[in-house]
A protein has these predicted regions:
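Short aromatic-rich membrane-water interface segments that cap or initiate transmembrane helices
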Residues: 76-87, 210-230, 270, 336-360
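Hydrophobic alpha-helical segments of polytopic membrane proteins
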Residues: 258-261, 276-315, 425-426
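Hydrophobic cores of alpha-helical transmembrane segments in multi-pass inner/ER membrane proteins
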Residues: 92-101, 156-175, 221-242, 280-297, ...
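Soluble extramembrane regions of membrane proteins in the secretory/endomembrane system
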Residues: 1-81
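Core alpha-helical transmembrane segments of integral membrane proteins
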Residues: 70-213, 225-236
Length: 454
């Protein structure tokens, strides 16, 4: 962080802010040039990154301006130090969880001679799945607290994850309408939407991020957070729709409307302010809508999805240009001359991020694309699954293909794809183990596909 003091025409006593951050006491280094140009009465071209600084008023909480800024700076460094251990620990946890889930697959369990332990492991993975899917939201909720070391966030995230995950499991495990994973997904997505409506306080110092700085945008959603929100929303909507997706057009339209609302909160400049995330969210919503239709997802629907997504993006950019005036909105609205340099920077950032975790990134991309292609191949187990459980199958296909769109249209798209996958792994595992012998009533709902016996 760099301290900055402004005085003279247009400035009063108090904290500085800009439309780049919309946070009292926080501005970007890129705000310096447009501020100077505005001070001397020169117009600010759309290709200029940053926004004009202005006075935001006194520091909140009765603090002096200096004390408030020092507290922000301290929390920034503490959060940055705590981020990697927390995120890496969770990724390792999901990796171990995934390996245990794969070991329960009939083919692998036979190879591992898992006849004795397979059913017991599947029963255990039921509640563990709910706990794992509840964890990511805690990385945002911890931002509501001030702490001085990495101990508090680890304890908070762990206790929250266990309390919410196990609480949802025991509360909804025998509910024939609302399973525990759906309950967690709906709750988590709702918390994130409500937080955006009230200014995005949880986005200031989130633990979730793909680097020491990514995520600390101070205003709007990072790509990692957007992927998490989209994953929660898709699986929550799919779980609520359930069997209603079969032959009931009204349920599909209601699901699309819910996902459209989530997409708007992601893209609108006064809320999520993530245009690349908006593109991915709209595309994912449309893929889910078409994939759950009676006709299924056909190739000819791809141009329709592209056209609708383009139209929706143009509309959100127009709304931003009229009412909010974020930098990204100005750049896109300014035409190719202003937008191309911004997209060029995004591509370079994306390539750099993929290179930093090359093997894991390429492996994840390859597996996600392979899954999407496999799900649409005829004469596979998916052919019957599309008919018996369109909500679950359509959601999985939408997340897989939508995460590829997220990868292509965001500078840190690999982070957005990653968080969508992190939400999906425990969700899919829960659906898989729901047929385990001895599982709760909810885990044996009609329409689920029991795993093969050894």
């Amino acid at each position: 962080t760099t301290p900055f003091i402004a005085a003279g025409k247009g400035f009063a006593s108090g904290l500085l802010t800009s439309s780049s951050t919309m946070r009292p006491g926080l501005v970007n280094n890129a705000d310096f040039l447009p501020t100077v140009m505005s001070f001397f009465g020169a117009g600010v071209p759309s290709k200029v990154t940053g926004s004009t600084m202005k006075t935001a008023g006194k520091a909140p909480g009765g603090k002096t301006a200096l004390a408030y800024i020092q507290d922000l700076d301290r929390q920034f460094h503490v959060t940055r130090a705590a981020r990697w251990p927390a995120v890496l620990g969770y990724v390792i946890l999901v990796g171990v969880f995934l390996l245990l889930g794969l070991a329960c697959l009939p083919y692998l369990s036979r190879r591992l001679r898992g006849g004795r332990w397979r059913n017991a492991l599947m029963r255990a993975l039921g509640p563990v799945s709910v706990v794992v899917v509840a964890a990511p939201l805690s990385f945002l909720l911890v931002s509501a607290f001030s702490y001085n070391s990495g101990v508090f966030p680890v304890l908070f995230c762990g206790l929250y994850t266990l309390a919410v995950g196990l609480g949802a499991y025991f509360l909804a495990r025998d509910n024939e309408r609302l399973d525990p994973v759906t309950l967690v997904c709906v709750f988590s997505a709702s918390v994130m939407v409500i937080d955006l409506l009230f200014g995005g306080r949880l986005l200031v110092f989130p633990l979730l991020g793909s680097s020491s700085l990514e995520g600390m945008r101070f205003f709007g959603q990072s790509n990692a957070v957007t992927g998490m929100m989209l994953g929660y929303a898709v699986w929550g909507v799919a779980g609520l729709a359930g069997d209603g997706m079969r032959g009931r057009t009204g349920v599909r339209w209601a699901a699309l409307a819910a996902l459209a609302l989530v997409s708007f909160t992601i893209g609108f400049g006064g809320l999520g302010a993530n245009f690349g995330g908006f593109v991915a969210a709209v595309a994912t919503s449309l893929i889910f809508f078409f994939a759950t239709s009676e006709a299924g997802f056909k190739r000819w629907r791809i141009p329709a999805i592209a056209a609708i997504t383009l139209g929706a993006t143009a509309m959100i950019v127009l709304i931003d240009d009229l009412f909010v005036h974020t930098h990204a909105g100005r750049a896109v609205a300014g035409g190719a001359g202003a937008a191309v340099p911004m997209f060029g920077r995004k591509i370079l950032i994306l390539i750099g991020q993929i290179k930093s975790v090359l093997f894991l990134a390429l492996l994840m991309i390859a597996l996600v694309i392979a899954l999407a292609l496999w799900m649409k191949r005829p004469a596979t187990a998916w052919a019957s699954r599309w008919k018996t459980d369109p909500a679950f199958t359509g959601a999985l296909f939408a997340v897989a293909t939508g995460s590829v769109v997220a990868l292509l249209f965001n500078d840190t798209g690999i982070a957005m794809m990653g968080t969508m996958v992190l939400i999906t792994i425990p969700t899919v595992t829960y659906h898989f183990v729901r047929g385990a012998p001895g599982a709760s009533k909810d885990l044996r709902l009609e329409g689920s596909t029991p795993p093969s016996r050894d």
